Amino acid sequence: MEKRYKEILLTNEYGKLLEAKKKGIPAVPCLPVIYAENPITAGNEKIMAKEMDLSGYPYVLEQEEEVEKAYLEKIRCRLLGLPCEILQTRRCIVREICLADVDNLYEIYADPSITLYMEGLYAKKEEEIAYTRDYIRYQYGIYDFGMWIIEDRQSGEVIGRAGLDLRPDREDAELGYMIRKNRQGQGLAYEVCTAILAYAKEEFGFEKLFARTRKENLASVMLLKKLGFHPVCAQSETKEADNAQIEYYIVLP
C-alpha cells in the first residue's frame, strides 16, 4: 500500500520507508508493516520483520483507519517543521510559533508596557531562538498545545500571543495572552481567548482552566471577568502588595 498526502509518503512497505529516508522524503509507516509487496521477496517477511525498526518514525498509522485530513495536515507540519494552524476567528489566525517569529516578538516586547506585568524575552536573541526551537519540539511535539502566535487575518501581521500552558503542580491548564500595544483596545484578546476556551474543551477535554494576573493590571482583570473567570485568591503576597497575583478560574461549559 502506498499513498501520498502532499509531500508525505504513507506506506506499509518497509523497503519504501527506507528508500524515502535515503531521499529525504518524510514518510509515515502504516501498520501492519511488511518488508515488500513483491511476492518474490514476500517469503522473507518473517525474517525481515526482526530487522524492521520503526523507532525513528514519530507517527505510525493503522492501514485500515480513516484518518481525518486535519490530522494528516498536522502530521505534515510536524514532519516538515512548519507551524500548525490552530484556529481562526473573525479577525485572527492562531497558529504555532516558528523561528521566523522571534524577530517580530522582539519588536513587540520592545514596548515597556508589554513587560510591565509579564516576563520578557531572553536578552540574547540566540538564546530565545534556542528556547523557541526546544519549545516547538517538546511542548508542541509532546502536548500538542502551548502558547501560540496571533496573526491578523488580512495583513498577516503578528499581533500577539495566546494559548494554554501547564504547570508542574497543576492538572488544569493556564490561559495566557498578550496583544501588541498598538492593537490593544480592539477586542482582539477577547475574540481569540473565547475561541481558545472552546478549543481547550473540544480538543483536549479540559473541564477547568485558570489564569493569573496582577491586581493592578485592570485590563487583564476586566478581560478575565468578561470571559467568565472567577477570582480564587491572591498569590505571592509580599511586602510589595502591588506584586500580588490574583488567580482566576473558569469551569468550561
What residue ranges belong to the model's regions?
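A short helix-loop-beta-strand connector motif used in the catalytic cores of GNAT acetyltransferases and
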Residues: 135-149, 160
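Conserved glycosyltransferase catalytic-site signature
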Residues: 13-14, 144
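Conserved GNAT-fold acetyl-CoA-binding loop/helix
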Residues: 113-135, 145-146
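Repeat-unit-sized solenoid/scaffold elements
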Residues: 130-131, 135-137, 184, 188
